[in-house]
Every structure is written in C-alpha cells, then in structure tokens.
Amino acid sequence: MRIMVHDYGGYSFPIQLSRALSERGHDVRHVYSKSVLAPQGSLQRKQGDPESLTFKGISLSYIIDKQSYMKRRRQEIEYGRLLAEEVKAWKPDVVLSGNTPLDTQKLLMKQCHALETNFVFWIQDLYGVAVNRILRKKLPIIGSIIGSYYVNLERSLLRNSKDIILITEDFKHQMKEWKVREDNLHVIENWAPLEDLPIRTKQNDWAKKHKLDQSKCIVYSGTLGMKHNPSLLLDLSVRFKEQKDVKVVVVSEGAGADWLKKKKLEMGLDNLLILGFQPFDQVANVLGTADLLVAVLEPDAGSFSVPSKVLTYHCSGKPMLLSVPGTNLAAKIVKRQGSGKVVEPFETEEFVNQAEHLIRDDIALKKMGRNARAYAEEAFDIKRITDKFESVFG
C-alpha cells in the first residue's frame, strides 16, 4: 500500500509510525512543513531504513506567522496547494493527515477525493473549536464570524473523511454533536518514541554546556502558544528567585518565549533560562537535566487539546507537574500512573506551592519518575500502535 503520512508540525511520534509502516512493506512518504516554528523530530532517513520510506519537506518563502491571522491564512492556503501537488504527483492509496490547519486540510482532502485516495483525518486538536473560542475572546464581533466558519469547516471535513482517528475518547462527544458517523471513528491515543528518548542523568553534555548540571532544574520543553499560559512559568521564576540553586528552564520559541524574555529583563530574573528549540538528538539530554518537568494548558483548551509533551516527558523517567484541567487525558494519565501532580489551571498559587514542595522532596520525585518510565514502556509499544493504524487503513 502507498501511504502518505502528512504531519504538518514534523513531530517525532508520527515519524516513528511512518518508519514502522515502511518496515511492514508499505511504500511510505512522510510529508511535513519546513516553515512552521515547532519542536520537530529527526526528519530524515536513518541507516537501515527500507528504501520504501521517503521524507518530503514543503517550504514557503517565510516562516508561518502565527500572530497575524490574515497572513497566516494566506500562508496555510499556499502550503495546502503545494501539499495537494505532492499528493497528485505521488498518488498514494491513503493519506493520513494530522496537526494540520483546516484551510490546508480542505485543499488536501479535495485533491484526495479527485484521485479517489482514501483520506484519514487524524485529530490531534479540535482546531475549529479552538479558533472559535480564542477569536471570540480576542475579537468579539468578527471573531465569532471567523470562529463559526472554522467550526463549520471542521465539521464538514470530518463528515467527508473516509476515516477519523481521535487521540482521546473525550473527542467523541463533539463528533456526536456534529453528527459525524460513529462507524468512521477510531480512538488511538498518542505516544512518544521510546527508542529515541533514553533515560539520561543531569550529568550530560547539554546540561554542562548550559551550566545546569549543579542546579535543581524545573524544565518546560515544547510549544508555548495561545492555548498555554506562560505567566505560570514566570510565577515559578519569581518564587524561586532567591533560591540560587534552582533554575527555571524554558525550551521554546515564539510569542510565549518572547514574552518571557521581556519579563526576565524587566524583573531581573537571573534564574530563568530561555532557550530555543533544541535538535531532536538533544531532547533526551534536555529532559534528563530536569528535576521536575512542567506542562501548562489554559482551562478552555482542555476540551480541544491534549498536550503531547506530557507523553514525551514520561519517556524521560522524570516527574512532572501539570497545570491542566483534571478532565484532560494528560491529567488523567499522570494521576492514574502516579507520575506527577496535577493542579487546575486557575490555581496559580497551588501550582507554585507544589513546585516548591516537590523540588525538595527527592523521594517523591524518584518514585514519580519510575512510574513515568514504567507507563511509557507499557503504553508506547510501536508494534501494537502500528497494528491499530493498519486496521484503519484496511
């Protein structure tokens, strides 16, 4: 079977899926954007890969501007046209597309239908729901018009997909509300590539390079966008400002990271270190540097997003502290597995208090870390995961 896996963000776990599918004899082309600001995986062939696995990055003239709605939309449409051309040229039997803006997804689906290629919509976030909620807050009048357009577009695309993969059972309620056919729905939870994320100690070259190997480190790694709350990371830095042995490390880029850089200078927060996205081969070292890993998600975002960084965190064997709605799948996993603590997003003081308590409790941290890795080793079996995707493709 010729399978095109389109992962707009270029993340690590879909790459692992593409590799696993190719090892089963499928011709696989892994397509991604080279113009999006995101923590991408290793988007290239490795020694021993089957010849049937290829990678294709699609570039625009400029990095996609997430802060300007009109410019961003134009860029996403341009990307969609280039992606459609790639599908037309390669002629896959099936296209699996995730992490994809709806304007792009629309053009991709249109091309798939023209070629009678099966289109599988891989829902990582309820994009239309997210846009609707965010824009209604920012632009009360026009935002509601734009938001309604994207909700309707997402619903239409889902209804016209051959199959739909949901990353959580929690999304089924929205599918029912949109009258999406239930027999088209398949739930496959996200994962992280365990083989690429070995356990590392703080005594690693990356930590030493950044002079973190002798400090207690609270680390945030990943996207810091509109559905996140960077002020919580600032609050952590303020709380630990006088505790010289504690560093708050943020590995991210974009608007959230830029805001933190500005606040760091204004407030003289020498304990706050803000770094850009690191090469994928350094991610294990970044996470290994942490004594405590943190993830944040705004209250509204809990219903349309699941922070995949939490799954990556589990591979590291390090404990975590989440400011995430308790109903979110990531929160449920952490609470069920005992791999960290979860605080509701509006409980800012409790979040900071928990961090201050945990960073000094080595026994609790070690136990949570062991639980985290144990969950990853049990849940992230790529053979079992690939079986599920193959059953969807038919």
Regions found by a protein language model. Give the residues of each.
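Nucleotide-sugar-dependent
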Residues: 12, 228, 277-286, 293-314, ...
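N-terminal subdomain of nucleotide-sugar transferases
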Residues: 1-49, 240
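Conserved donor-binding/catalytic core segment of Leloir-type glycosyltransferases
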Residues: 209-228, 234-237, 249
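Acceptor-binding helix/loop patch of EC 2.4 sugar-transfer enzymes
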Residues: 63-67, 117-151, 195
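Carbohydrate-associated surface elements
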Residues: 170, 191
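Nucleotide-activated donor-binding/catalytic signature segment of Leloir-type glycosyltransferases, i.e.
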Residues: 249-252, 257-284
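Membrane-proximal helix-turn-helix segments that form the acceptor-binding/catalytic region
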Residues: 106, 110-114, 127, 144-166
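A short, well-ordered alpha-helix in the C-terminal region of glycosyltransferases
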Residues: 350, 357, 364-378
